[in-house]
Amino acid sequence: MSEPKQYVMTYEGVKKLEGELEYLKTVKRKEITEKIKVALGYGDLSENSEYDEAKNDQAFTEGKILQLENKLKNAVVVDESEIPKDIVSVGSKVKVKDYDFDEEVEYSIVGSAEADPMSFKISNESPVGNALVGKKIGDVVEVVVPDGVSKFEILDIKRG
């Protein structure tokens, strides 16, 4: 049998997932239970869209809970003190010059379980994150992206 996938995460990422899991188990489950009770009060379940919706919401939430529990159970937390100061790694904040847009951008390199590109948290498994990991200040990387090749120069590296 194969080993379960391990999720490299920062301490901050673990705390965020734990908070989301707690919310789903306490608040969201109660809300759904209440919706189901109300829907059952409407009688005939064969054409009760409120009941169907609540049951679908329940199934989605329970699936999300299992997913979060699995990620947390298989999390490998990056020790902040072991994050190198001069090499990009998970837990680093890296400032790069994006040559496509001629601008400076700061990314946090995180594990795939906590990636959020809209917040500039990119996974070490993403094309850009993977290209940056292991590099130093002054290095220039070229990354194959869906619309061609992007070029980045590493300007600064900090611990997350």
Curated annotation (Swiss-Prot):
Belongs to the GreA/GreB family. GO terms for molecular function: DNA binding; RNA polymerase binding. Keywords: Coiled coil, DNA-binding, Transcription, Transcription regulation. This is Transcription elongation factor GreA. It comes from the Bacteria. The keyword Transcription regulation applies. Necessary for efficient RNA polymerase transcription elongation past template-encoded arresting sites. The arresting sites in DNA have the property of trapping a certain fraction of elongating RNA polymerases that pass through, resulting in locked ternary complexes. Cleavage of the nascent transcript by cleavage factors such as GreA or GreB allows the resumption of elongation from the new 3'terminus. GreA releases sequences of 2 to 3 nucleotides. Pfam families: GreA_GreB, GreA_GreB_N. Residues 49-75 form a coiled coil. PANTHER family: TRANSCRIPTION ELONGATION FACTOR GREA. GO terms for biological process: DNA-templated transcription elongation; regulation of DNA-templated transcription elongation.
